[in-house]
């Protein structure tokens, strides 16, 4: 299982421009998927429908060479990171163009039920979704360049506690806040320190550990 990154993307600007983004991201599409069949010892191909994807990296940028995209990734153990994702297989292409391993679009079988959109009181919208291992920085950068009149803010936090807030305007990202850890109790950033007595990380401010129990040694 991957480490998950929890993302919140706000989009603000003129309501007509926001409506264009909403329509783009929620545009219906279909994709072919391959999976290994242990009974037949072959790869099975199936088509997945996305009638109401809500938010889809596929609707921001998609590969031109679908034949190459659907090939099985060929990565070698110990291969340098800068050489791992040069191919056009789905894994390499996704990492290069989206910044993360998988899309977050909601399929008709509700595979990604954690993806949602909220209307904000100021007229903007917020998308909420989870990505594997890393935030979708490349995808949001491309989306921002496609809509230069809108302001995109990506808030993300990995399940171990590191995260950031990045603002995108006209394809340019600016880091507003970046941290290595955050206390889930008091929200203090970069405040976690290892306690030998507790055997876990404890917030230096509120003395709570990751399990949200008070550290008696603080």
What positions do the PLM features span?
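Short glycine/proline-enriched coil/turn segments at helix->beta-strand junctions
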Residues: 148, 191-192
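Short, intrinsically disordered terminal segments enriched in charged and Pro/Gly residues
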Residues: 210-218
């Amino acid at each position: 299982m991957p480490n998950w990154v929890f993302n919140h993307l706000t989009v603000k600007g003129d309501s007509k421009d926001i409506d264009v983004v909403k329509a783009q991201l929620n545009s219906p599409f279909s994709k072919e998927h391959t999976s290994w069949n242990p009974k037949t010892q072959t790869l099975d191909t199936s088509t997945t429908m996305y009638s109401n994807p809500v938010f889809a990296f596929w609707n921001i940028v998609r590969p031109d060479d679908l034949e190459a995209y659907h090939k099985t990734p060929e990565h070698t153990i110990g291969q340098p990171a800068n050489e791992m994702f040069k191919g056009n297989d789905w894994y390499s292409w996704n990492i290069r163009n989206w910044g993360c391993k998988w899309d977050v679009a909601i399929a008709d079988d509700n595979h990604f039920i954690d993806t949602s959109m909220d209307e904000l009181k100021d007229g903007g919208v917020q998308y909420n979704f989870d990505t594997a291992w890393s935030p979708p920085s490349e995808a949001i950068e491309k989306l921002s360049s496609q809509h230069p009149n809108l302001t995109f803010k990506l808030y993300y936090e990995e399940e171990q506690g590191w995260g950031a807030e990045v603002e995108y305007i006209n394809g340019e990202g600016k880091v507003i806040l970046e941290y290595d850890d955050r206390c889930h109790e008091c929200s203090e950033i970069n405040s976690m320190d290892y306690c030998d007595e507790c055997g876990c990380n404890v917030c230096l401010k509120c003395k709570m550990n990751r399990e949200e129990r008070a550290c008696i040694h603080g």
